[in-house]
């Protein structure tokens, strides 16, 4: 069964910026080069219309530079929520790039709602990866969001309470 051709016109400018950022992060990892240098090269190439290189959106630049700067924290967050059978290095490079874009938005871009970062990441996975990637990426991103929400000072008090005190309280109640 073949997939229908995606309708790129229905996607927002931000979605297209995320897609381009994932492309650049993927390329940078594949070529072992700095992703910010790729952006700078593309900006220069886009100045001459004869090169056929599309201009780089400001949001693409923001994502790529932010993800490059925070790569260790982003990769740690992703690795923390991978299933025990998987390591970050074992995840397909395209899936890593997509998750890096989404996790950067979740952890470091307060202007993007977490739900938007998650949905757009899953949409990118559906577009670029295999059928199993989208649900897996959804689960990892959801775990990152849940952990970030629990650590947030804006989170409800119940989300900040660890599980042990509740278990201790039940045990203490049983001894009376």
Curated annotation (Swiss-Prot):
HAMAP family: NusB (MF_00073). Residues 148-176 are annotated as: Disordered. The keyword Cell cycle does not apply. One of its GO terms (biological process) is DNA-templated transcription termination. One of its GO terms (molecular function) is RNA binding. It holds the Pfam family NusB. The keyword Repeat does not apply. Involved in transcription antitermination. Required for transcription of ribosomal RNA (rRNA) genes. Binds specifically to the boxA antiterminator sequence of the ribosomal RNA (rrn) operons. This is Transcription antitermination protein NusB. InterPro entries: NusB-like_sf (IPR035926), NusB_fam (IPR011605), NusB_RsmB_TIM44 (IPR006027). Belongs to the NusB family. It comes from Corynebacterium aurimucosum (strain ATCC 700975 / DSM 44827 / CIP 107346 / CN-1) (Corynebacterium nigricans). One of its GO terms (cellular component) is cytosol. Residues 161-176 have a biased composition (Acidic residues). Keywords: RNA-binding, Transcription, Transcription antitermination, Transcription regulation.
């Amino acid at each position: 069964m073949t997939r229908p051709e995606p309708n790129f016109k229905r996607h927002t400018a931000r979605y297209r910026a995320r897609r381009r950022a994932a492309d650049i992060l993927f390329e940078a990892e594949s070529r072992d080069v700095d992703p910010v240098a790729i952006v700078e090269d593309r900006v220069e190439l886009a100045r001459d219309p004869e090169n056929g290189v599309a201009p780089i959106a400001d949001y693409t630049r923001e994502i790529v530079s932010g993800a490059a700067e925070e790569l260790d924290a982003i990769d740690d967050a992703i690795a923390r929520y991978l299933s025990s059978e998987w390591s970050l290095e074992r995840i397909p490079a395209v899936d890593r790039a997509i998750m890096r874009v989404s996790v950067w938005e979740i952890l470091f871009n307060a202007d993007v709602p977490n739900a938007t970062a998650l949905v757009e990441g899953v949409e990118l996975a559906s577009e670029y990866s295999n059928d199993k990637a989208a649900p897996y990426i959804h689960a990892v991103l959801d775990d990152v969001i849940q952990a970030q929400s629990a650590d947030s000072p804006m989170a409800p008090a119940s989300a900040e309470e660890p599980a042990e005190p509740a278990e201790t309280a039940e045990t203490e109640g049983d001894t009376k």
